[in-house]
């Protein structure tokens, strides 16, 4: 890859050319890990992530290129957008796990995500039971029982996330791909549901405070 401005050969796809200082385009296929100079991994060093994000964001902040030519302004905006997305996603354990799964072909954020895998029957029954119980508490405006459910669901969410992370480590280390993908997918599907449940209880609390 060469710099679009001075044609210098670039190594490791820098955000700016070390020779002429011009902002470079986002490379085709760049991942959120690439944006922050990280290898795909379940764990990341958060202080390093924070430092790299701030350093690179300062280099390409669009305000610095208000008078630059249109091409460089566009590149600065693209780099900034990617950096912000990378920082927002990779600093969060669950979001990072979902993204790692997506990089390996399972995107649970898609509308048709449910059709990508068959969830265990026991989990589907659990979902129905939780839903019915929460609906009952909501109808009765019984906040304390809902909070008790939320505490239990929070523990289940944490356990499911740990299960997903174990499967993703196995996947990244070259383990049995199909089994690791299925295990991570099922665990993260539970994380997604439990997260929504907790958000609904939080909404109940906000409604109670507003009354």
Regions found by a protein language model. Name each.
Residues 1-211:
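C-terminal accessory/regulatory regions appended to core domains
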């Amino acid at each position: 890859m060469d710099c679009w401005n001075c044609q210098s050969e670039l190594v490791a796809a820098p955000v700016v050319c070390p020779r002429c200082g011009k902002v470079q385009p986002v490379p085709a296929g760049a991942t959120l890990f690439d944006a922050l100079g990280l290898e795909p991994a379940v764990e990341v060093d958060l202080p390093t992530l924070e430092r790299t994000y701030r350093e690179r964001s300062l280099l390409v902040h669009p305000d610095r290129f208000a008078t630059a030519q249109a091409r460089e302004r566009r590149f600065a905006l693209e780099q900034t957008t990617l950096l912000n997305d990378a920082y927002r996603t990779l600093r969060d354990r669950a979001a990072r796990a979902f993204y790692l799964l997506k990089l390996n072909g399972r995107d649970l954020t898609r509308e048709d995500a449910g059709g990508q895998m068959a969830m265990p029957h026991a989990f589907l029954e659990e979902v129905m039971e939780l839903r019915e119980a929460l609906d009952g508490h909501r109808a009765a405006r019984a906040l304390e029982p809902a909070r008790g459910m939320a505490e239990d669901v929070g523990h289940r969410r944490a356990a499911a996330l740990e299960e997903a992370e174990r499967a993703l480590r196995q996947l990244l280390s070259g383990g049995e791909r199909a089994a690791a993908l299925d295990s991570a997918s099922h665990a993260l599907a539970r994380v997604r549901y439990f997260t929504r449940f907790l958000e609904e209880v939080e909404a109940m609390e906000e409604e109670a405070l507003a009354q």
